[in-house]
């Protein structure tokens, strides 16, 4: 199992705090209007990507800093997804912060979903994940995503992409490198099965 030293984690947490302090303030009311383009995928419960087939991620209750960073990654091409790149590309800094503030304004409350992997095994295997993502997937560090209640197949896709390098992140690349297909399934099941997690954004 790969582990980081306490100093490594301290550096990550300090970096997260500095990043958080540097971000502009988002307006959730403005973000609600700007999110309109996103509703066709992210506001439909159970909606799936065309190919490969996996659920479009739940965003309600996610950390705004993480959402903003993800949108910037799509803008720059660091995360490869043609539709997301096209939608994120024209956004300005304030647009990104407003959208992030809007999705973060939803209270995490999702019920556990039916799962395919072994959640009990995933809990044991998640020991390396907890420093950033929390023991139950409810990360308290703004730049690291909450995972509780996220779609299981989306989590499997994300971990597989980190492992293959299709999704770029040096830390996640190193942590996923030794994982088997079963490990990925079990970890995904554990985080997806946690109550009080992410929800589908539902504009009123």
Question: Can you say where each PLM-predicted feature lies in the sequence?
Answer:
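N-terminal signal peptide c-region/cleavage motif recognized by signal peptidases
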Residues: 19-21
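Sequence/structural segment immediately N-terminal to covalent heme-attachment motifs in c-type
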Residues: 25-48, 114-138, 150-151, 204
């Amino acid at each position: 199992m790969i582990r980081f030293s306490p100093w490594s984690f301290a550096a990550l947490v300090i970096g997260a705090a500095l990043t958080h302090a540097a971000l502009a303030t988002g307006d959730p009311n403005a973000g609600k209007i700007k999110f309109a383009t996103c509703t066709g995928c992210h506001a439909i419960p159970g909606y799936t990507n065309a190919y490969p087939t996996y659920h479009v991620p739940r965003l309600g209750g996610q950390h705004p800093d993480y959402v903003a960073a993800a949108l910037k990654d799509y803008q720059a091409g660091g995360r490869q997804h043609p539709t997301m790149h096209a939608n994120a590309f024209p956004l300005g800094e304030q647009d990104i912060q407003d959208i992030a503030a809007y999705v973060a304004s939803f209270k995490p409350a999702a019920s556990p979903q039916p799962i395919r992997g072994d959640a009990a095994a995933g809990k044991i295997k998640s020991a390396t994940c907890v420093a950033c993502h929390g023991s139950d997937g409810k990360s308290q560090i703004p730049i690291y995503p909450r995972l509780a209640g996220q779609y299981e197949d989306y989590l499997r896709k994300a971990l597989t992409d980190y492992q293959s390098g299709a999704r770029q992140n040096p830390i996640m690349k190193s942590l996923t490198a030794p994982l088997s297909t079963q490990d990925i399934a079990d970890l995904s099941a554990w985080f997806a099965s946690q109550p009080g997690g992410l929800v589908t954004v539902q504009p009123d």
